[in-house]
């Protein structure tokens, strides 16, 4: 079975197309309970920092609050209070994928790509998606987009008759 903690990690990654490391390094001070927003800090190369702000459904915020209790600091920790390592997270996702009967290896990165693909299918522009995922260019967004070549604007618009 998938633990409530693992489920929350997956939901935070999926809603915002977040990198696993952004979720694992999340601190309670970056959560705005009133506005249902979480600020994710991105460590970029060359030492620059960038942040993305993601709005979550109230149901997710309620589960997150219940998970945290009155604890502060790192949001996701082990039973012994240590940070969750990326290798551990990868193992949790792989196990969850097998339990769910998914025929390919499930990783946090798969969820990130799924977010981009879904937002593209819903008609969001690359610039809107970049604000969510923190991608630095439209080219990177396109690299994550897994929609088929056949699925394009000509399915929705008839320019000629």
Can you say where each PLM-predicted feature lies in the sequence?
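Basic, Lys/Arg- and aromatic-enriched nucleic-acid-binding interface segment
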Residues: 1-20, 150
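N-terminal core-binding DNA-recognition domain of tyrosine site-specific recombinases/integrases
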Residues: 2-4, 82-88, 105-107
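The alpha-helix within a helix-turn-helix
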Residues: 13, 24, 130
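Conserved tyrosine-mediated DNA breakage-rejoining catalytic core shared by Y-recombinases
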Residues: 25-66, 139
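Short, polar N-cap/turn motifs at the start of nucleic acid-interacting alpha helices
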Residues: 31-33, 124-143
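Catalytic-site neighborhood detector that most strongly recognizes the C-terminal catalytic loop/helix
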Residues: 44-46, 133-158
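C-terminal catalytic core of Y-nucleophile DNA break-rejoin enzymes
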Residues: 45-65, 73-94
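Short, basic (Lys/Arg/His-rich) helix/loop patches that form interaction surfaces
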Residues: 90-131
């Amino acid at each position: 079975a998938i633990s409530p903690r693992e489920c929350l990690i997956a939901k935070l990654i999926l809603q915002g197309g977040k990198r696993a490391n952004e979720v694992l390094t999340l601190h309670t001070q970056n959560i705005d309970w009133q506005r249902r927003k979480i600020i994710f800090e991105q460590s970029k190369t060359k030492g620059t920092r960038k942040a993305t702000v993601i709005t979550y459904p109230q149901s997710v915020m309620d589960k997150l609050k219940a998970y945290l209790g009155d604890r502060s600091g790192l949001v996701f920790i082990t039973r012994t209070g240590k940070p969750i390592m990326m290798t551990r997270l990868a193992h949790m996702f792989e196990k969850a994928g097998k339990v769910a009967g998914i025929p390919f290896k499930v990783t946090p990165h798969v969820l990130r790509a799924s977010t981009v693909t879904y937002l593209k299918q819903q008609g969001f522009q690359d610039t809107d998606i970049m604000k969510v995922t923190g991608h630095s260019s439209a080219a990177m967004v396109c690299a994550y987009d897994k929609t088929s070549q056949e699925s394009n604007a000509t399915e929705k618009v008839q320019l000629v008759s």
